[in-house]
Amino acid sequence: MLRHPYVLAMTVGILFSVGADVGFSVAIPEYLKNVYKVDLNRAGMGPTVYFVAKTIAAFLGAVVFAKVSAAKCFPWCMGVGLAATAAIPLVGTPLAFLVCVFIVALMTANSFGMCMGLAIDRVPEKTNEITALMVMAIVGGGLVSALLGVAQRAFGAVGIVGVLLVCIAYLLALGLFAQKRA
């Protein structure tokens, strides 16, 4: 299946989607503590904001994707998610940071489903194989976590944001790629 360029691109998309998801959920409290000097108890609420937005996005995605194709939504969602991620180092308050986090989660929450759905739509006769491949890509998302650790040690909080930007930028490029092939 990895010989099929479209399926390969979507598989890498799953890897970056999972990596960004895990990265954000782990990095949010650290970022709040290190950049904004928020105490540990309050910083622990950051992931709650992230997961509330992801939950809302999952429900909205079920409604939106019943009416609009994932190929049309994918680049728009990732573009807004990328912009919100890029804004993180520029905002000056914990509240503004959490607003950015909420927007990122809202926009990127359905990236896994979009990658998988688009790959299956492209090669429907290989649904089982694609599904197995995508599940394996979930494990690969752990590679991004390792990169986050390296980036944090080398560049601090900005390094974390840099790795997350790369993940979401790939997803944006993937969305544009999918839109052109739809």
What are these regions (language model features)?
Residues A109-P124:
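Intracellular juxtamembrane helix-capping segments at the cytosolic ends
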Residues L2-T48, T55-A58:
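Extracytoplasmic gate region of multi-pass secondary transporters
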